[in-house]
């Protein structure tokens, strides 16, 4: 991605919601590499899909020769950002936040190159400058530059002030000052001149721009990426089970891959622009090919492959594809013990059972059948498989060889209804 027209290229991909002084920023980028940053607050023990677009934007800038700073908010995570939140966040302990900081720093690291010369990425933590700051310094050196009149008129805060059931605490109201000071600090330490973030961060970003100008007399810029929406109006990045996380222990690579496979045709080509590094020409060619093929579109598989590889690496992608193929074909011989652990985590419904159970009881306990009577009929009708093998004996008791790796048995009713037994 060439640096001189980087903003235009991001706009072509639909990746720019708002930008401050676009012309001046384009000029600054044309002069040579800049340092830029994006902040990630540790509000949970993992990043989720909502963080992926700004994180990949940092990567896009680095690929164009710029220096990314990934800021993990060890201090701001203790306070909580009120922007567009309906209610006050629960405050977490310092120990919890520190634990989450470490996890998020490790999650961010694989997306950026920390050893590539001049534009090597930097990992920063705002606890480094806020941890020992006293309240008088905060109020005198930072607070005096902020107008409360302007702060209460910011859209992100106004919504909370206008709610009768939920006001805003001074703690959360102060968040804007903390994030603003982050920008000024990073400008002084690393020469950072651009902050990127989600569109909900616009108010915090512009505060940082104003504060940096007042404290250091430097012109800096802000760019927000859009809130990702789905064509049908439902929320992006959520499943029935909740958020889709980047941590494989919270959302398995298989489940992650399946999330992208299930992308609607109306969204898939847009998402390829947001979440992959394919060129616009490649994406348009794929769309044209899908339109004219007369078959099921290929785009969902391309999207799932590209994003799963980005987040979980080649091994994670291959495991996800292997599990998908085995569930489709019914042959489980290629699955490893780790693959079954992914299925047990969130891949298919799971039930724990004591050894000595019979098949009818397993079908009832797994909710594949409502009663033993119904289970008997279903088994007799040849509609049940155990580890991919048909079983038509209603009196069947599980054998040791049915317990793969001594732990797992996969039941299937019909073509698509699965349950994994984890033996105690």
Curated annotation (Swiss-Prot):
InterPro entries: aa-tRNA-synth_I_CS, aa-tRNA-synth_Ic, Rossmann-like_a/b/a_fold, S4_RNA-bd, S4_RNA-bd_sf, SYY-like_C, Tyr-tRNA-ligase, Tyr-tRNA-ligase_bac-type
Residues recorded as bearing N6-acetyllysine in the entry: 144
Record carries keyword Acetylation: yes
Positions of the S4 RNA-binding domain: 357-414
Coiled-coil segments: none
Pfam families for the chain: SYY_C-terminal, tRNA-synt_1b
Residues spanned by motif 'KMSKS' region: 235-239
Locus of motif 'HIGH' region: 42-51
Gene Ontology cellular component annotations, sorted alphabetically: cytosol
EC id: 6.1.1.1
Binding site for ATP: 238
Compartments, as annotated in UniProt: Cytoplasm
The protein's enzyme class: ligase
GO molecular function, one term: tyrosine-tRNA ligase activity
Main location: cytoplasm
Function: Catalyzes the attachment of tyrosine to tRNA(Tyr) in a two-step reaction: tyrosine is first activated by ATP to form Tyr-AMP and then transferred to the acceptor end of tRNA(Tyr).
Name by which UniProt lists this protein: Tyrosine--tRNA ligase
Species the sequence originates in: Escherichia coli O6:H1 (strain CFT073 / ATCC 700928 / UPEC)
